[in-house]
Amino acid sequence: MAAAPFLKHWRTTFERVEKFVSPIYFTDCNLRGRLFGDSCSVTLSSFLTPERLPYEKAVQQNFSPAQVGDSFGPTWWTCWFRVELVIPEVWVGQEVHLCWESDGESLVWRDGEPVQGLTKEGEKTSYVLSERLRASDPRSLTLYVEVACNGLLGAGKGSMIAAPDPEKMFQLSQAKLAVFHRDVHSLLVDLELLLGVAKGLGEDSQRSFQALHTANQMVNICDPAQPETYPAAKALASKFFGQHGGESQHTIHAMGHCHIDTAWLWPFKETVRKCARSWSTAVTLMEQNTDFIFACSQAQQLEWVKSQYPGLHARLQEFACRGQFVPVGGTWVEMDGNLPSGEAMVRQFLQGQNFFLQEFGKMCSEFWLPDTFGYSAQLPQIMQGCGIKRFLTQKLSWNLVNSFPHHTFFWEGLDGSRVLVHFPPGDSYGMQGSVEEVLKTVTNNRDKGRTNHSGFLFGFGDGGGGPTQTMLDRLKRLSNTDGLPRVQLSSPGQLFTALERDSGQLCTWVGELFLELHNGTYTTHAQLKKGNRECEQILHDVEVLSSLALARSAQFLYPAAQLQHLWRLLLLNQFHDVVTGSCIQLVAEDAMNYYEDIRSHGNPLLSAAAAALCAGEPGPKGLLIINTLPWKRTEVLALPKPCGAHSLALVTVPSIGYAPAPTPTSLQPLLPQQPVFVMQETDGSVTLDNGIIRVRLDPTGCLTSLVLVASGREAIAEGALGNQFVLFDDVPLYWDAWDVMDYHLETRKPVLGQAGTLAVGTEGGLRGSAWFLLQISPNSRLSQEVVLDVGCPYVRFHTEVHWHEAHKFLKVEFPARIRSPQATYEIQFGHLQRPTHNNTSWDWARYEVWAHRWIDLSECDFGLALLNNCKYGASVRGNVLSLSLLRAPKAPDATADMGRHEFTYALMPHKGSFQEAGVIHAAYNLNFPLLALPAPGPAPDTTWSAFSVSSPAVVLETIKQAERCHQHRTLVLRLYEAHGSHVDCWLHTSLPVQEATLCDLLEQRDPTGHLSLQDNRLKLTFSPFQVRSLLLVLQSPPN
């Protein structure tokens, strides 16, 4: 090091170096001002369009002259620029860039292919035309730059998460050719890193002073106006970074990454272009840096690129073969980790892994979900069943209350399955390669001493962008520098292999990974939640009926292609910013259209399968009553009449089968169960009684009593009211659509605005009901019909709400005459317990939680279950069961939840445990109504059942055609243990089964899993909450 004296003033020395590299201060004489040399203008022309045109069509449009300073827009439009350039001959031998700065996101097209994204926000403002211009290179070129009128993070008006500004205009601020000085860039990287070391290690560190002294000497030596001084300065930096650390250094595995939300503050169609912008840039970086590895998730995005940018897709496949482009995740999209059903989660992997295998030759080894809002306790089992034992995320670093105690650990799921989990300790998936981030990765690591390896994801994310060459340059400098951890450009596989070597020292976390934030996403955009639940049910039913039709009809063609398309739409909507409701209005509208596509195409598939199912059966033309659930059901059903009206009938349908609809002459004159009695008292209250439960409603519609008749046990707390609607103020700290804060509970106000007296609806017999109106506020109202059917163990609340609020939260509460320290909540393929008290911060941080179809509060021998058909937010505090109904956030969608809503919830008191009482079956029944489908020909006059299960603890969840079997007449059955018990059971079938074998969730045959068929029965063994899948090869039916 040169021995130039300087005063011992740390701050002035530090800031001197800062100014020497500043892009703002003293650029007329500092090093940053020499990054670019000579420049020349380009010739511009443009055209503006509201459409997202393909390149071939765009370049055929009429372009008009344009210039720097031009404005274009508005939001979501696209401006195409034709850039005609001539490189000066005197630049031969130099590196030449197109310098481009504009608002919005840009994509450079060269020779008809996308070659690089350009965004100011993503620090990509130049495109390398030539790394070293040769005399033989063409100097006249025409490029096209496609500029999307939105930023990396959308176009929020005044705030990132505000609704988009539809009038926002965009401007081109720079377009020119310039000579790029790579040696200046290299020195700038060196000096920035030296400053980072000096600051990061602090004034107590010898190495910090060495870094600062080195940087200061470089400034002394380097004259920006004299490039011949650069090598001496560079030598000082090389000496510093070449001083290596010891063997105990922590190793950071740096992986290129570009998190692109499949939709969020921009619509789905813009995401397609974000992928092209980001991944074309990554391809260029992989070409220039053979040690650079880029991890990429989400099969849906790759499928979009394959369809719309086939040349780019081919390049990605090429780099995948080289090991530089690494598909990760294994799922169709990075889905929400809470709301999708267990079967939908399986399909995320089934569709994703099959796509990766088809397009890249292998399946993913790591589950990759860095940005979702919590992680179901069933994910470890689902992952393992899909060939994955490694999981990477970091979202729990966002916890608002408790700091999660691990960064590398084993996660044990509901059934006992274990996977290795890593949270990158830098608590980000968008690192930029700074010294500060590298140091935080070590100092913040909560598993120091247990493992000496950490992951480090670098690249701009959320809205795309990805890594830059500068990030790579920084990380390469830090590969092995004394005082810092060792940094190696690595892959997810290399990281987890290193972690597995240290796995004997790791701790285990059991149960769900609950994010203590974003609890509002269980409720926001209720219509999206309803669409999700309904479409999961539709696809389930279509698959069941189509499978049965395949088994019974030689002519029936299973609609595999149509079902794959509909499933992929549903899986797309389960992206973690869509089904959660944390998206802009454009996205919500697209998602609702996708749900409508599933309904409109799914219902005809149901009818076609039903027609094929009963083809050739004797009997009169009429209706077929179909049960798609694996237990016998006796229920009241509204059957259509020829005149268009409906009549009620009590029908019994066997497990996964059908029964003929009763004709008017066949209706029983006497009911096998006690009929429903309805009585209105003089005080206006109404009592409904079916001999199983007795319901009493006060004149406002509140529940004053709910009695289990056989025992006389009252379920409603003494002096309290059930079915009490309550309104809360709902103003979070920032994340409007995402968060409901703990303090909202302090603002509870019962809804007391009665709009009409309680009236009797249906007067009894097969069904009794009462209805009422409620004025929630001057702008919002509610109507509800309370329904009790003969033989039904629960009372239903059919609810319609006209909701026009701002930052309010509507819930319904049921105070129970029950005491228990924990409540039970249904999750995917099972259930779990959460506390009803606030003993610890981990307990009270769960003030708002999620569940699927039911929650239950039980004490010894008695309990109360709250069922629903489309809600997810819930809580049980003390003895009060609460269901979250509607929110009213204003960002990023100002219209979220406004308008009309319909939903149903139900209340079921029960003797004994919820398992013994059949709560799980009841919740399924509420969500999967019996189907009354017209038989186009003669309807069968006898009942028929395809499958049944001997144990009520085992649920036959799915019946579908196998995806990849060579024999098309192969079915997949998926069953799970629902009670939390070890069970041996028999699966009965009437189908012509030729062979039965166990398989994994990806439908790959278990070589040791052959099952013997005995009298049309298969014996199966389950451990608690275990999910098992079978392949059934069918015999061909007679023609």
Swiss-Prot record:
Catalytic activity: Hydrolysis of terminal, non-reducing alpha-D-mannose residues in alpha-D-mannosides
Disruption phenotype: Viable and fertile with no gross defects. Loss of neutral mannosidase activity leading to accumulation of free higher-order oligosaccharides such as Man(8-9)GlcNAc(1) in many organs, particularly liver and heart. Tissues show histopathological changes with strongest defects observed in liver, small intestine, kidney and central nervous system (CNS). In liver, hepatocytes appear swollen with increased levels of glycogen and accumulation of lipid droplets. In the small intestine, enterocytes accumulate glycogen apically and also develop vacuoles in the basal cell region.
Gene Ontology terms: cellular component: cytosol; nucleoplasm
Keywords: Cobalt, Cytoplasm, Glycosidase, Hydrolase, Metal-binding
Alphabetized CDD domains for the sequence: GH38N_AMII_Man2C1
Pfam families xrefs: Alpha-mann_mid (PF09261), Ams1-like_1st (PF22907), Glyco_hydro38C2 (PF17677), Glyco_hydro_38C (PF07748), Glyco_hydro_38N (PF01074)
UniProt key word Heme: no
Identification of the protein by name: Alpha-mannosidase 2C1
Species whose genome carries this gene: Mus musculus
